[in-house]
Amino acid sequence: DGPVVYPKKPLPDDTPWGEHMWNKNYRNENGVIQTYDSGTAPCKAACPLHIAIQGYINMASEGRYKDALKLIKKDNPFPAVCGAICHKYCEKECTRSSVDDPLAIDDIKMFIAQQDMKDEFRYVPEVIPCNRVGYDQKIAIIGSGPAGLSCAYFLALEGYKPTVFEKDKVLGGMMTTGIPNFRLEKDVVNAEIEILKELGIEFKTGVEVGKDVTIAELREQGYKG
């Protein structure tokens, strides 16, 4: 019945490209398409501490650095430290990378923390008043590394007055003795620890639990936990 004729398809070389061929507002419109009204943002889900990343970035964009720091410190006692050494799992999941590059989430967090460290009156989280039985109990925490200091921080926010025992002469554990200064400056660690002291946390350095003092002796001194 005659030769088969296929419809001719335009090739790239046949197409006159110009501004009429693309959407100048692609970035913003693409972001709206990938935005959901509910659920957890991928960046927050990827963060080991589940910090409210969208919240503090929005506050920082409005210049509300104290509010942004307050939001961060609900979950993270050491934003300046994390700003220096964080693995940035949040940025790896940032949906902005589908358009161009992920947001500089970690740098924003570090910037917020730096604004506070430069301030004459630094932000000290509000402590819940001791209004329940047992809040005056003495609590001993062994070691002043990230885990020990975090434990002391959240206990202090609940109204307790924990005591941190550190065998070394300096506080901070691996943050101070294990991470080189070019990655994490010691002044940054010390600045974070100063806020813990403002919360009423007591520190005893040069005391090795199990050698200089035993658990039984701590019990005798009135420590309940």
Regions found by a protein language model. Name each.
Residues P16-H20, H50-S61, L69-K70, D75, ...:
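Beta1-alpha1 glycine-rich phosphate/pyrophosphate-binding loop at the start
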